[in-house]
């Protein structure tokens, strides 16, 4: 009887131990599963947050690109307006210089015309002196060659200036100038001077008219505004 009781007790203890072990294992597994589930939830929430952040960033990037594009368009428009403004200023300054409202200076050339130093006996004196036509020829040649401003004996010329010979003097816009006559021009001397000295050109023609003529480069030709010149 005792043997049966011992066997029964052992069996009960074995079953109890198994149940306890099984319960512990299940509890451990459940805890592990719960922890994994919680970790997965955290990872999912984090991943979802990252996706939302990326979506938000893309939205901001798009807005930034649109604003940058607007800024570039505004800059280009401003550059164009600025360029047009400077072009207008430049054209206005050129026009003011052309009509003689402003004083100008720069490199250029000076052409000096003088009456012939020797007049053969019996020859007509008028054939050996400087006339307005000679001065006109020089002035026109300089303008054609790109002169920005021209003066005769320091007096600025305008688009409607007149030059008239009156005996030994030449009248420019009502102001008389005695010989020699110096025609000054502001412009590229490497263009102006060759245009005068070309073979068979103006200087050769003037020499054939018995006019003493010389042309030289000048580093700094200065001209006053026309209104001040006429004062």
From Swiss-Prot:
Keyword Disulfide bond in annotation: no
Matches recorded under Gene3D superfamilies: Protein of unknown function DUF881
Induction: By vancomycin.
Coiled-coil ranges (or none): 44-94
Pfam families associated with the record: DUF881
Keywords, ordered alphabetically: Cell cycle, Cell division, Coiled coil, Signal, Sporulation
GO biological process: cell division; sporulation resulting in formation of a cellular spore
Span of the signal peptide: 1-34
UniProt record similarity statement: Belongs to the UPF0749 family.
Purpose: May be involved in cell division and sporulation.
Name of this chain's protein: UPF0749 protein YlxW
Species: Bacillus subtilis (strain 168)
Upper taxonomic lineage: Bacteria, Bacillati, Bacillota, Bacilli, Bacillales
């Amino acid at each position: 009887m005792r043997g049966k009781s011992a066997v029964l007790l052992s069996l009960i203890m074995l079953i109890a131990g198994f149940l306890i072990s099984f319960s512990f294992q299940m509890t451990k597994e459940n805890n592990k599963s719960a922890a994994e589930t919680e970790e997965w939830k955290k990872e999912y929430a984090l991943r979802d947050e990252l996706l939302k952040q990326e979506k938000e960033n893309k939205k901001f990037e798009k807005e930034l690109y649109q604003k940058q594009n607007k800024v570039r368009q505004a800059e280009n428009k401003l550059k164009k307006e600025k360029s047009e403004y400077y072009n207008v200023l430049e054209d206005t300054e050129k026009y003011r210089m052309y009509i003689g409202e402003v004083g100008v200076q720069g490199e250029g050339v000076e052409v000096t015309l003088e009456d012939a130093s020797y007049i053969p006996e019996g020859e007509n004196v008028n054939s050996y002196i400087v006339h307005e036509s000679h001065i006109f020829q020089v002035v026109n040649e300089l303008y054609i060659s790109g002169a920005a401003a021209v003066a005769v004996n320091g007096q600025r010329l305008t688009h409607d200036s007149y030059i008239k010979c009156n005996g030994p003097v030449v009248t420019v816009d009502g102001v008389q100038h005695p010989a020699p006559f110096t025609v000054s021009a502001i412009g590229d001397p490497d263009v102006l001077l060759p245009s005068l000295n070309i073979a068979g050109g103006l200087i050769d023609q003037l020499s054939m008219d018995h006019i003493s003529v010389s042309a030289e480069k000048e580093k700094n030709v200065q001209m006053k505004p026309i209104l001040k010149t006429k004062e």
